[in-house]
A protein has these predicted regions:
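Active-site nucleophile elbow and catalytic-triad environment of alpha/beta-hydrolase enzymes
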Residues: 190-209
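Conserved alpha/beta-hydrolase "acid-adjacent" motif
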Residues: 226-232
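Catalytic histidine-centered segment of alpha/beta-hydrolase-like enzymes
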Residues: 227, 247, 251-266
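Alpha/beta-hydrolase active-site loop
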Residues: 39-61
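Short beta-strand/loop motif that positions the catalytic acidic residue
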Residues: 213, 219-221, 225
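Alpha/beta-hydrolase-fold enzymes
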Residues: 60, 64, 70, 78-181
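Short, surface-exposed "cap/lid" segments of acyl-processing enzymes
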Residues: 1-36
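Catalytic histidine neighborhood in serine/cysteine hydrolases
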Residues: 233, 238-255
Length: 299
């Protein structure tokens, strides 16, 4: 809901969706759409309901009783809430650099501290505009607007670098507005009050208790993530009731870990192996060596 879905299908060879399909995993991506002015009243409950409709549609299309959910960044937070509310619908959950303990949110948490940040004032005129979202993330690393061009000048002769750079630039600049009511809840209840981590977050009158989650859980963290520091994500594993829960650490930042040059060799096969070892035993042996090479630690 902050950037568009295709970061997980960026371009051939640098696509998590493509890799999952190549490993024999039926894969579906949820496009949240682009909010219009009238969507300012799209609240948190309706956002979770949209995710629930997606799950029902995938189940109808595949005939499966349950689905494995993978959520990236805010999508992971939303998916964790959904899984806690409807644990019987989810066979496995992959938290891909998504914050759960927002008190560990680093600079982004400081940026939206309630002492100086009012999400209601920010959205008084309607949806939060896309440029404001982009500027907020840029403020976490102000020099990145310049350093990326220095990097391009330094590496443009490397095979495929310019293509990857342009694809990522296209996606990074393709921001969308954030629905006002959903934004207010996201910032106030999760970032400022940390209600999800405290077990006090309610959706439609139901408490989102992460302790309800008993399915296998994999939390993926990026070692240099400034948007979701590792501790903000690994809190997931502290709260779930799953007997099968692991942490996978990938080198890189919040975006680089997912679409960077190492992602096709590190992230994609490791996540595929984790899923296949649980739901496709016949295919697991040929991937087990890849999983062993990754920094995977069982909790």
């Amino acid at each position: 809901m902050i950037n568009k879905w295709y970061v997980l299908d960026l371009r051939p060879g640098f696509s998590m969706a493509e890799s999952m399909v190549e490993h024999g995993i039926d894969t579906y991506l949820l496009d949240w759409g682009t909010p219009n002015d009238e969507d300012r009243y799209l609240n948190w409950e309706l956002v979770i309901a949209k995710l629930a409709r997606m799950v029902r549609r995938v189940k109808r299309h595949t005939g499966a009783d349950k689905v494995a959910l993978l959520g990236y960044c805010m999508g992971g937070t939303l998916s964790s809430i959904y899984t806690s509310l409807y644990p019987e619908q989810v066979a496995a959950f992959v938290n891909l650099t998504a914050p759960i303990d927002f008190s560990k949110g680093g600079l982004l948490r400081t940026l939206v501290d309630e002492q100086w940040f009012d999400p209601y004032a920010m959205t008084a005129a309607g949806n939060l505009p896309a440029p404001q979202m982009e500027n907020g993330f840029t403020s976490l690393r102000p020099t990145s607007k310049f350093s990326k061009w220095i990097m391009l000048a330094d590496k443009y002769q490397r095979e495929g670098f310019v293509e990857s750079f342009n694809a990522l630039e296209q996606w990074a600049g393709d921001n969308i507005p954030f629905p006002a009511e959903a934004y207010q809840t996201y910032i106030h209840e999760l970032y400022q009050q940390n209600l999800l981590y405290k077990g006090k977050h309610f959706v439609g009158g139901k408490r989102a208790d992460l302790g309800n989650i008993t399915c296998p859980v994999l939390t993926v963290v990026a070692s240099r993530d400034t948007i979701c520091p590792p501790a903000a994500a690994t809190a997931m594993n502290e709260l779930v009731s799953s007997e099968d829960e692991s942490v996978l650490t990938i080198s890189g930042g919040h975006v680089g870990a997912v679409v960077g040059s190492r992602a096709p060799k590190q992230l994609y096969p490791a996540v595929a192996a984790w899923l296949i070892e649980r739901f496709g035993k016949d295919a697991a042996p040929r991937l087990r060596d890849v999983n062993a090479e990754a920094d995977v630690t069982a909790e």
